[in-house]
């Protein structure tokens, strides 16, 4: 702004100097000399002020444009900073001193951590129970109960698998036993039916 003011004063001084130097009039116009000089000076001052105002407006517009451009640039930088993705987090690698575990070892370690966090027992724990004699696994490694021992013991009280034959069964396999269905004596009526010339009215 001070630069523009100095430029305007310089232009004004040059214009006034030219006006005083080139304003040579004859004696007839000597009375109006002061009026002509001031009129020309006023016109030149008006022109100089107009030029200075234009220059000032252009400078101000350029300055405003620069400020606007700087603000726009700062806004773009802020938006770019906001829109930029955060740097990737450093993932903990299982590689220690150049040693990288295999997928099987990684899965085994993951299963151990999972069981530790959830309180689950490994499968080998149950297998050890089953292999141990007298372990608490009633399905795979249990002591034989008394009923099973009775079934394999001769004369045990198991009536289905190992029981003594009843008297009725012994009578059925014994000839002449009192079983009327399997081993009985033929009645007189039956003997008459199979004997020729008997008075059986239904068969003869």
UniProtKB/Swiss-Prot annotation:
Keyword Signal part of the UniProt annotation: yes
Annotated GO CC locations: extracellular region; host cell cytoplasm; host extracellular space
Record field: compositional bias (Basic and acidic residues): 139-151, 160-172, 181-193
Propiece span(s): 142-150, 163-171, 184-192
Record key words, sorted: Apoplast, Differentiation, Glycoprotein, Host cytoplasm, Repeat, Secreted, Signal
GO biological process: cell differentiation
Post-translational modification: Preprocessing of the precursor by host proteases leads first to the production of 21-mer CLE-containing peptides (Arg-130 to Lys-150, Arg-151 to Lys-171 and Arg-172 to Lys-192) followed by an ultimate C-term trimming to give the mature 12-mer CLE1-1 peptide.
Domain of life: Eukaryota
Region (Disordered): 116-204
Positions bearing carbohydrate: 32
Signal peptide interval: 1-21
Region described as Required for secretion from the host cytoplasm to the host apoplasm: 21-83
Summary of the tissues where the protein is detected: Highly expressed exclusively within the dorsal esophageal gland cell during syncytium formation in host plants.
Family: Belongs to the CLV3/ESR signal peptide family.
PANTHER family: CLAVATA3/ESR (CLE)-RELATED PROTEIN 20, CLAVATA3_ESR (CLE)-RELATED PROTEIN 20
Protein name listed in UniProt: CLAVATA3/ESR (CLE)-related protein 1
Species, as recorded: Globodera rostochiensis (Golden nematode worm)
Gene transcribed to yield this protein: CLE-1
